[in-house]
Amino acid sequence: VGRVEWKQDMNKVVSFLKSLTWKQIVLSVIIFVCLALWAGLTVFATVKKNGLLDQTAAKRWSDENNAAQISCFFTESTEVDKNRIRTFENDLDKVLLEASITAPNENARLWADAYSASGKLTLSSGKTSLADAAAIGIGGDYFLFHPVQLLYGSYFSGNDLMHDKVIVDEEAAWQLFGSNDVVGMEVRIGGVPHYIAGVIKREEGRFAKAAGLNKTVIYVSCETLEEFGVTEGIDSYEIVMPNPVKNFAYNNVKEKFGMDETRMWVVENSARFSLKGLLT
């Protein structure tokens, strides 16, 4: 009985296909190809975005798709210090208040930001030293935007009262201590004790290579880098904030910093790494 029913069903399918015109067949093929292409592009975009965690802070900050991540890059001749950033933050709070954008509760934050400076410094442990290592001095919630892969320990915040935390990669840990499980160990920077907060896996791939992150990079506070290292000062600023309408966040960040394009380059990461942005 089962074979008879199957044969009858197949006959119906064959009859249906024979009843189609060439125009209907071509249209059906086009629709199928478009659906397959759309599905493939969606998977491609998702995989690519997931590999760029430092570009997707807005998605991690809000599941409601109403936030934007904005990055600002300053030229070498542009001087930006913590006071300038504090002034910007105060101006931003006023903008959000005027737009009647408020936090859902008193413990919630409307925005989070970070800034960083690139440079070099030397750190030592006993008779072993790591000279002129590439360093990033951080401020604010830097690791919210750059969740580098921790092997041991934890991140630290640029807002910490003490500025004596260090994050190293596993290669640097081996060079300094002969082990990669070194959380809490002391290193000296400029003769001042600092302590290993975390050990990370060194980043790989062409994006990491382009950013110079495929080699040893030490993460310290901006204060440590400025005092004991060599740096040109703060060179980037990042924020994730409400974006109730298109370009609200981008336009306000650009306006409140008040710098022209010869001094500051502004990017909306969340738009740049949308499906449309990834394909253009």
Which residues make up each language-model segment?
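Hydrophobic secretory-pathway targeting helix
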Residues: V13-D54
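Extracytoplasmic
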Residues: A67, L130, D160-H163, I234
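Solvent-exposed, non-transmembrane alpha-helical starts
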Residues: E79-N90, T128-A133, M162-D164, E203-I218, ...
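The feature marks short, hydrophobic/small-residue-biased sequence motifs that occur predominantly
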Residues: A108-Y155, D160
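Membrane-proximal extracellular/periplasmic loop immediately following the first transmembrane helix
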Residues: V43-S118
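N-terminal amphipathic/basic-hydrophobic helices that include classical n-h-c signal peptides
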Residues: V1-D9
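Mid-to-C-terminal secondary-structure elements
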Residues: D141-L150, V168-R263, V267-L278
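N-terminal targeting leaders of exported, membrane, and organelle-targeted proteins
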Residues: W22, A45, F273-T280
